């Protein structure tokens, strides 16, 4: 039986979100060019054809007008309008990206205050996949799998993953009633190692290396028949 990984695709690219949040210096043209090259062409066209208020409200939806975000909104809008007034945005929106869809990756999220890593993994997995986590067999006897890397924004990140097994007849889809999933996730599915490697963006080398490590680990189990009876049609997915 083929080993498959559960992957999710973000609704928006990380750099589209960073741009709308004003996470750039308005005169750093090289940085801005870099950000736009990592967006999708659809996102670039949205920026080209809409004002900042529309883009902000579409991205953040019901939370867009919350008081705690108004300072960031005003700062980001001022930067956006500066780029527009000085014709910088015109040049940026002429960029043709190599990417047609946002980033693919594994379910993950940010810990709440005082939340344990495993509890965060279970919560975020449920929110992003809409799967009943109680039906998954988490491999608690394994060490967590860590991914340390520098993001496209230049910041250091550390992701902690947990391995879980799931029956291969488990279906996944975007559920309209799951607001968390609808806000953040654009697509979801089971993919072979070969498919998954080709779907992850090539500059995400640490994520590809992580996928390779897990795949080799599972193949080792398969051939040695130590803990998991793969004859029972088992595939695997990752949690964070």
Predicted regions and their residues:
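Eukaryote-specific, low-hydrophobicity, charge-rich regions
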Residues: 7, 77-101
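Active-site micro-motifs of SAM-dependent methyltransferase domains
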Residues: 13-15, 127, 198
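The catalytic Nudix box helix
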Residues: 100, 105-142
